Amino acid sequence: MGNREPLAAAGQGTAYSGYRLRDLQNVAPTNLEILRTGPGTPMGEYMRRYWQPVCLSQELTDVPKAIRILHEDLVAFRDRRGNVGVLHRKCAHRGASLEFGIVQERGIRCCYHGWHFDVDGSLLEAPAEPPDTKLKETVCQGAYPAFERNGLVFAYMGPADRRPEFPVFDGYVLPKGTRLIPFSNVFDCNWLQVYENQIDHYHTALLHNNMTVAGVDAKLADGATLQGGFGEMPIIDWHPTDDNNGMIFTAGRRLSDDEVWIRISQMGLPNWMQNAAIVAAAPQRHSGPAMSRWQVPVDDEHSIAFGWRHFNDEVDPEHRGREEECGVDKIDFLIGQTRHRPYEETQRVPGDYEAIVSQGPIALHGLEHPGRSDVGVYMCRSLLRDAVAGKAPPDPVRVKAGSTDGQTLPRYASDSRLRIRRRPSREADSDVIRKAAHQVFAIMKECDELPVVQRRPHVLRRLDEIEASL
């Protein structure tokens, strides 16, 4: 049987309002100051003040790699000495692409007339020119400082006199034995709608929990589902951090009558994010990040998530993660993270990629109808707008990164399990879970002032105190 004919009154309120709402779909994009990232744009210049991943180390072979980052066409390569170069793609001589250049012992040589550039863009040789040519003193190839770390290639694309130190956080090296495995995921949409997805934690209890067509293959459905407590609707709060240069959310869930799980994920402006355990509610008393990533614009309608999966016995004691499945445009958790699935499968088992990219190349914020669950997304946009407008104080992470004396920097992304008995009413139980979450966040902030060797013992001791008080 088909649908009945609508009642005559339908469409006067909210039912069958397609015709009435049709023209409203043609709104212009808003928040352009944080969506556009080309040279000279507010967000583009802001992002250029930070080190950005541009490719994976495994992509640098014996030939150059053409890349596009922040609207700039570039070429990345590793010369035979092992030094990494990130140069403007068009040769300074006559514009031939250096993606066809020949990697040298030192630098790269253009295939057209043999101009030879070092990784810093210095012209080393122009073979067809007279020996006394002054070109080497007056011409250079556009180049950006670059380095490799744990399988990612980073470049700094901003003003030379404002280049910051690269911040090294606790989770990059701790606990002992941590392995950072690089990955990338390509998204055919603006960077911000992907970045916002990370702070929109409510979707983990919905999109990632049996949001599948009835009768779909059980193995496929399980692969798209977050296990171990993620299906419980979280009690969430969002808080600015780092003098409004970042934010976190706390998500509290009850796991049993006697146990509560507190999860914290953190964003660092402009485009860095760190998440705690991914495969399940971490069974440890306290564990750190399981993933760090940057959402890097290619242009305004394409972006790439570059990052590391953190592998260690603390965040993945059951060894469910699969290092071999991380790499170029692939990652080892949750079906639906990449663009490589058959269309019918994406309809039956939609994932992050489908939910994010289907918003359009640039999501139209003017069409949104936000609710209370969207507070974090709108806080993120507000912080970004203030940052590009110069309203935020200096980023303390940038300041501390240059004066750590070899100490890694603390961050807050973590999972903690607390023995807290269930309260008689749902409201009272929600209140105690929220209180515990706020106290866990306060504990993590206390570590800002502690040397690295004291941070974990301090957290564990203070978690005991929270349990005793609640």
Swiss-Prot record:
- InterPro entries in the record: Cholesterol_7-desaturase, Rieske_2Fe-2S, Rieske_2Fe-2S_sf, Ring-hydroxy_dOase_2Fe2S_BS
Instruction: Name the Pfam families for this protein.
Output: Rieske
What factors induce this protein?
Induced in the presence of tert-butyl alcohol (TBA).
**Consequences of knocking out this gene:** Mutants are not able to grow on the tertiary alcohols TBA and TAA.
PROSITE patterns referenced in this protein's UniProt entry, alphabetically: RIESKE, RING_HYDROXYL_ALPHA
Name the UniProt key words of this record, in alphabetical order.
Answer: 2Fe-2S, Iron, Iron-sulfur, Metal-binding, Monooxygenase, NADP, Oxidoreductase
The cofactor remark states: Binds 1 [2Fe-2S] cluster per subunit.
Q: Is-annotated flag, keyword NADP? A: yes
Q: Does the keyword Transmembrane helix apply?
A: no
Q: List its EC numbers.
A: 1.14.13.229, 1.14.19.48
UniProt cofactor(s): [2Fe-2S] cluster
Q: Name one GO molecular function term.
A: iron ion binding
Q: Which domain of life is it from?
A: Bacteria
Biotechnological relevance: how is it used?
Shows a biotechnological potential for the synthesis of enantiopure short-chain diols and unsaturated alcohols from secondary alcoholic precursors.
The record's listing under Gene3D superfamilies reads: Naphthalene 1,2-dioxygenase Alpha Subunit, Chain A, domain 1 (3.90.380.10), Rieske [2Fe-2S] iron-sulphur domain (2.102.10.10)
Q: Give the top-level enzyme category.
A: oxidoreductase
- Could you give the subunit structure recorded for this chain? This two-component enzyme is composed of an oxygenase (MdpJ) and a reductase (MdpK).
Q: Which family does it belong to?
A: Belongs to the bacterial ring-hydroxylating dioxygenase alpha subunit family.
Question: Could you identify this protein by its name?
Answer: Tert-butanol monooxygenase / tert-amyl alcohol desaturase oxygenase subunit
The lineage, from the top, is: Bacteria, Pseudomonadati, Pseudomonadota, Betaproteobacteria, Burkholderiales
